[in-house]
């Protein structure tokens, strides 16, 4: 699996969420609404989720192993930091 495109959109409000990202896998499948969040230990990603009836949030799509999660997170954070440095982050709606 290759991440063939990463689109970064800045979140305009103040807070821990810094951006919303979409990734394309193998030029065939897109995952929207991956969040870049500032945590106590630095930036991390949160996969798209939905609030369940019990009030808990459940991921809609997510990697099934830590190697894939680390790969996706590394690429997204690299693209986010590069876009932030270059000023190439579009505003999220």
Curated annotation (Swiss-Prot):
A Pfam family assignment: SpoVG
Single GO biological process annotation from the record: division septum assembly
InterPro entries: SpoVG, SpoVG_sf
Domain of life assignment: Bacteria
Keywords: Cell cycle, Cell division, Septation
Stated family: Belongs to the SpoVG family.
Function: Could be involved in septation.
Protein name, UniProt field: Putative septation protein SpoVG
Lineage, uppermost ranks: Bacteria, Bacillati, Bacillota, Clostridia, Lachnospirales
């Amino acid at each position: 699996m290759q991440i063939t495109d990463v689109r970064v959109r800045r979140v305009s409000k103040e807070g821990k969420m810094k951006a919303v990202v979409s990734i394309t896998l193998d030029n065939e499948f897109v995952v929207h609404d991956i969040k870049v969040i500032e945590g106590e230990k630095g930036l991390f990603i949160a996969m798209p989720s939905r609030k369940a009836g019990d009030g808990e949030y459940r991921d809609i799509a997510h990697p099934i192993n830590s190697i894939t999660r680390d790969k996706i997170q590394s690429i997204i954070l690299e693209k986010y930091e590069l876009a932030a440095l270059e000023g190439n982050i579009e505003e999220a709606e």
